[in-house]
Amino acid sequence: MEAVIKVISSACKTYCGKISPSKKEIGAMLSLLQKEGLLMSPSDLYSPGSWDPITAALSQRAMVLGKSGELKTWGLVLGALKAAREEQVTSEQAKFWLGLGGGRVSPPGPECIEKPATERRIDKGEEVGETTAQRDAKMAPEKMATPKTVGTSCYQCGTATGCNCATASAPPPPYVGSGLYPSLAGVGEQQGQGGDTPWGAEQPRAEPGHAGLAPGPALTDWARIREELASTGPPVVAMPVVIKTEGPAWTPLEPKLITRLADTVRTKGLRSPITMAEVEALMSSPLLPHDVTNLMRVILGPAPYALWMDAWGVQLQTVIAAATRDPRHPANGQGRGERTNLDRLKGLADGMVGNPQGQAALLRPGELVAITASALQAFREVARLAEPAGPWADITQGPSESFVDFANRLIKAVEGSDLPPSARAPVIIDCFRQKSQPDIQQLIRAAPSTLTTPGEIIKYVLDRQKIAPLTDQGIAAAMSSAIQPLVMAVVNRERDGQTGSGGRARGLCYTCGSPGHYQAQCPKKRKSGNSRERCQLCDGMGHNAKQCRRRDGNQGQRPGKGLSSGSWPVSEQPAVSLAMTMEHKDRPLVRVILTNTGSHPVKQRSVYITALLDSGADITIISEEDWPTDWPVMEAANPQIHGIGGGIPMRKSRDMIEVGVINRDGSLERPLLLFPAVAMVRGSILGRDCLQGLGLRLTNLIGRATVLTVALHLAIPLKWKPDHTPVWIDQWPLPEGKLVALTQLVEKELQLGHIEPSLSCWNTPVFVIRKASGSYRLLHDLRAVNAKLVPFGAVQQGAPVLSALPRGWPLMVLDLKDCFFSIPLAEQDREAFAFTLPSVNNQAPARRFQWKVLPQGMTCSPTICQLVVGQVLEPLRLKHPSLRMLHYMDDLLLAASSHDGLEAAGEEVISTLERAGFTISPDKIQREPGVQYLGYKLGSTYVAPVGLVAEPRIATLWDVQKLVGSLQWLRPALGIPPRLMGPFYEQLRGSDPNEAREWNLDMKMAWREIVQLSTTAALERWDPALPLEGAVARCEQGAIGVLGQGLSTHPRPCLWLFSTQPTKAFTAWLEVLTLLITKLRASAVRTFGKEVDILLLPACFREDLPLPEGILLALRGFAGKIRSSDTPSIFDIARPLHVSLKVRVTDHPVPGPTAFTDASSSTHKGVVVWREGPRWEIKEIADLGASVQQLEARAVAMALLLWPTTPTNVVTDSAFVAKMLLKMGQEGVPSTAAAFILEDALSQRSAMAAVLHVRSHSEVPGFFTEGNDVADSQATFQAYPLREAKDLHTALHIGPRALSKACNISMQQAREVVQTCPHCNSAPALEAGVNPRGLGPLQIWQTDFTLEPRMAPRSWLAVTVDTASSAIVVTQHGRVTSVAAQHHWATAIAVLGRPKAIKTDNGSCFTSKSTREWLARWGIAHTTGIPGNSQGQAMVERANRLLKDKIRVLAEGDGFMKRIPTSKQGELLAKAMYALNHFERGENTKTPIQKHWRPTVLTEGPPVKIRIETGEWEKGWNVLVWGRGYAAVKNRDTDKVIWVPSRKVKPDVTQKDEVTKKDEASPLFAGISDWIPWEDEQEGLQGETASNKQERPGEDTLAANES
């Protein structure tokens, strides 16, 4: 077994690379195969006959058990075995065809390959070497029959044609089915390969499927390939290979094949069978390394190419390893040349780099074979890695998915997986049986057992589906299919011009049914058998009623034989008459003109076709034969026309098509606009979606329409998130009155066709609300559905600017009534919008409906509405480019240069919208004068907002937010300046929408000005004849800009613009104006479609030439005029301010005084110091509530104001303030508290200021360091007495340690200050040792209740632990009560004895009156801690955890994974206590019971000092117990024992002579021996300590880190 595993593992590493299985996986697979009886011995794995049974068995196991590990391992092993056999066969074939000996080997296969002796010996684990005699015998040529030769030279004898050598000129490839070796006998002869072909002889490359000479010198035209692929996308970096005539010729690769391969890779992917077939075809013959790399660069992207290069290198290394072992390997030239290497195989050797001629001349045929085969194998690996196949086990047939589509997905996934080929068919068939729909599964179960392939199963299912019951839609599709012969006959007749007298087209013959003649001209005319027979229909002679021409109303011309009456030639089917009557007496076949209204360039805009008027068709379908090839089409939402037997694919016109019917007199019916379907049908059909629009009247409609109106073509499918599982929210109950109203509204919507009955698995609630008029409104709560949708992006970036309408043009406003209800939902999305109409008391089944149109409240409804209406109006925009049509949601505004043009355009727009299914409210059509649109009133020259109230009601933050939103909407029209918006912005600060707000005086004054402004200000409509001007200015609290005309003379504003709120701490005015100019230019182009003609800048820019860099960047590309003038009068309302470009701050020293500043967060002071002669002057400011940055800024501001008219140097160690002050070199807008402080100081100065930054606490000597140190010392100096410490604590409530450092007082004084604070000491201070552990058993217990759900119904466990011995007692209770606590303690006393004290939390069960009385009767002291806090209860809390873990382990061991049966709970609880108390825990050598009943006698330990509250170390103590984090110490004088934290204990080295000797020391403090300096007995104590460590008591296991 081990030898076989070793051989297989080596083969897998060779042929599988990094993904090879481990030896452990191979061994597990072999063990499984032997266990299942699939292998008699491991060596049977080498037999090809056993591969298929193993594959089938492992595949079935993976399907049944879901365990595919062995199958994956077997797939890799099988691949390695097959590759090894193929390599052996290839080697034998290569040797044979190259004339180097070896027998002719048949293609590899289980039946024809016999294991050689070497392999059989390897099966037995023997190491086998090949002798020289064996190799010679194997290499010797074998006598064979004369093969059929082709016209190329022979490898063995060199004969041109017809040689009798046992070789063929087109040798077989190493893999079955592909030709591999070309005729390259002369290539590389000068390297000593023994050929006779001269250097210049041309040897053609053997192409796939043929052999012969190449037509002269040629090359692979990579440049042409690159040009053809330029439009397809893949990056092409290959360069052409140029082969000169003096070198050996190399037949080029066909560029078309490479182009087609690259396109296949891009569209089908790397793993596609089509891709692999094309790659194998291109590489069926040897290629140069240059061609191989160029080919891979073309078809692979950068990342796959990098993977391929690595994989190719690995494959070539394998070839080199094989060639190294075998000197006569084909790559070594059969031993007649130097051995190959990696540089030669990659074309990197001398004379080969970038030289295709050198590669063709120097590479041996065997090397070319290895290069190409390795490249192909590397491509297969890259295809598997770059495009991993999807998991086939997760594929199931969808509810609406056809079986063929399901089979396509499944087969593609299985064939792209790593399953062995022999396992794929069984897997596919099993998936058919388990993953298809239930009805398909029943069909497959009933299938005969002889169906064993996927193809047979698919054919069987499709055949059975054909006899399924027919539906209405199926019958309609069958009729449509059956009518095609008649339609084609008539269409051909019309096209061929076969007309009778008077130009009328002839019908069908009464006798034979053929077109082109009547019965009278029929050559097959029969004489009437009974000329005297009378017709009962027309009372005529010579025919009966069945033969009467008047029967069908076809002007005496009956349908032919086999054709029923009407337009449906369906034999043995009910006759279906046309469901229409045509007032103009037209025939069903009409002449139609189609006009393309799109903007795409086409050869012809209009075409004439013949179409059938068909009321049985839901939609209009244009035959692909009639559809112009250059008219664009797109994929439809429903890509098929469904009917019996499935459907036919269809597409939809991308452009709107105008359809017009030509009457007999040549006139044109009213044309109709629609998006027709385009399909491969035998004749065009005008369906019900356009018959009414063409003036036809429909009667007796057959069947039920499956589409709504033309608008269905405009339905936009919704996008759902990946996890859009159905949502079901129950309908909440409604009162009877609202339920009646809901029922009425639902019935109304059902009659209008807005909803339809539903059986959807989605449901969301509906409700009604009463409107002001008293009627009810239906609302649908779609929040849960919206959460599953992917919102559409915004398609309209804001509302249109109405002032851009040309001045003086007449206007018309249209309103679309119920716009959402006029646009249908895509059919596949309707079920998600289902709801339930409940009944009272569930007395009847609830009725369920779903929306067919856009529901209100759906997140995508507004966007879809805008898209659909815009798509309907797009042809009109193209048809009337001069018409101004503003569309926002369901509101339309039309503007034309004349009243007549406006009326004509309005009628056309209304007609187009109505034909598309929309409704226009006639009473809402507005015409001048005084139209209103989007909240504005429009006149012939102005645009003014409407709807401002006298004074809004403000109560909350949300009210202020709504008001500010309304003002933001009005600002561009009214020009509300920033100073009037400031009071409202101030009220927006806050985070709670319900936070109270008041209508203060500032808001009232600002609102009064805004209302006054709305009565006088308005926008002027744009006059295209006048230049467009723009202006900007600085004003209070911001900047303002305007677009208009005549701004400097007679201002006519068209649009106001404002600077944005600052986002930085400080923004210079120059930057604000730069951003506003950029915004103004962009708004002009976006609104008016043109650049500003004249730009007015503030006068300061005229004085400062050239213009600043920021202004120049804002004016980049500006071609208009720039004027600098005083502020225009139009800005008076904004109170404009002068812009100063003067620089106020510099970073270079200036002549003048120097001040140093600093601030401290500990003292909350900011100071300024400066030198006056020999001494330093100091000025300081203190603010306990300010941050250190604000203190630094205030200190610098204080320094700036010391000498406001004198240049001043300010030195600071704050980088923050220094950088900010430098940015404030020019005037600007501050936005933070620090920036406001500095800006206020700079605005009061008239002289230059320099800010200099130095590093604090630097040791560099000099004036700056000295001044900074003085400022720092003054900022941090404080002399707080005890009273000031109390004041500091009262203000900040800091702790004693911080108070001690801040006020330079002792810790004891600081603690006393904190303890006197009533807010910081709601509980008394805890002394050290308040939570001691017992020094011996029965001194202190800890008790707690813990919940264990596994012990339900009595799931409360009372736990008591002895703090000295760690012994645990547990009892079980149903509730936490005082009685339960008392019962538990009585049990614990019976087990362990009566304790002196018990500590618990302060729960009611422990602090009740009855519990206190019970403890008093037993004489037990009781203390409490903090409930829910481990402080004081750490040991029992850890005991709870330890107990629960033990219960869980014991329960799972008995098979109780969740709840423990009641009958087993008592026994299991006893087992847990036994395990915890009677066995050692951790490193302890004694059990808790042993420590409890045989305690260790404690003796005094070494002397120590303890730290008392004053911070001093007190002597006179000895250690009794050293625990985890705490120690018990005993006073030598008073015998007082206390517990103190271990950090407050240290050895008392002054008392070493009084130390208790080691034989008297307690083992409980052995852990501290490493820091007790016993000099005289150091070694002895250490030895004792080592021995004592093994006897440390067990309480350390439960010791608490109690503070």
UniProtKB/Swiss-Prot annotation:
Its EC number is 3.4.23.-, 2.7.7.49, 2.7.7.7, 3.1.26.4. Mg(2+) 3 binds at residues 1344, 1401, 1437. Residues 1333-1496 form the Integrase catalytic domain. Residues 1548-1567 are annotated as: Involved in homooctamerization. Residues 609-690 form the Peptidase A2 domain. Reverse transcriptase: Error-prone enzyme that lacks a proof-reading function. High mutations rate is a direct consequence of this characteristic. RT also displays frequent template switching leading to high recombination rate. Recombination mostly occurs between homologous regions of the two copackaged RNA genomes. If these two RNA molecules derive from different viral strains, reverse transcription will give rise to highly recombinated proviral DNAs. This is Gag-Pol polyprotein. It comes from Avian leukosis virus subgroup A (isolate RSA).
